[in-house]
């Protein structure tokens, strides 16, 4: 029995498997969201010392996505396996660390839940195959990029560029849109925000967008084609503006405070994938 036949014969089992996979991936995404910016900062500092001719200093302890093992953010005690079960551990421990009782951020279960639900949604919309695999990759990366940009105002090249190339590779087989539309979409996506960036900078002397935003929209264009770009930007702008105004009103923040645009591009990208399979704007 192949995977498509299994999914059609046992749909509940298949969807449950995707939900559990999404929760597990979400747990890993939490590691990426927290550690990747720190890893990049360490790398940038080392490169800066080298280019400035400064001493290298003491060798840094290994720090990557696999090491050291997950630990309590308060007392730094290594987490037990049963304390690291996606979503369930946080609920069971009522948002507290088992080792010291410190509060554990709601961000961790939220990321796991978003990842799990997005995988479940993908299973409802796509049959097992290349399109489903692409959708799962996109949803996972969108969740990670949105969270990283919201925390650090950074969209790492190590995520946006593989997302861009992945869109072109998947569309070699016209998985989401024809390859010609994907290539034009990648170029147009980058250039559109690049032009807006420079126009605003010349008129106001300030920067309204980051270069990571250019690359993320280029990646969305590579997955969904150039025809989707106006709607992607419109959705990202409207949702971002609405959420920003509400957030600033609630927390009484200054309108001059810079805010991330990447999370809203990620939201629009996820909506674009869904509308694409439902016969939306890309056709």
Curated annotation (Swiss-Prot):
Membrane topology summary: Multi-pass membrane protein
Cellular-component GO terms for this entry: plasma membrane
Subcellular location: Cell inner membrane
EC number: 3.4.23.43, 2.1.1.-
Membrane-traversing stretches: 13-33, 106-126, 128-148, 153-173, 176-196, 216-236, 259-279
Catalytic activity: Typically cleaves a -Gly-|-Phe- bond to release an N-terminal, basic peptide of 5-8 residues from type IV prepilin, and then N-methylates the new N-terminal amino group, the methyl donor being S-adenosyl-L-methionine
GO biological process: methylation; signal peptide processing
Pfam family, one: Peptidase_A24
Function, as annotated: Plays a role in type II pseudopili formation by proteolytically removing the leader sequence from substrate proteins and subsequently monomethylating the alpha-amino group of the newly exposed N-terminal phenylalanine. Substrates include proteins required for biogenesis of the type II general secretory apparatus.
Name by which UniProt lists this protein: Prepilin leader peptidase/N-methyltransferase
Organism: Dickeya chrysanthemi
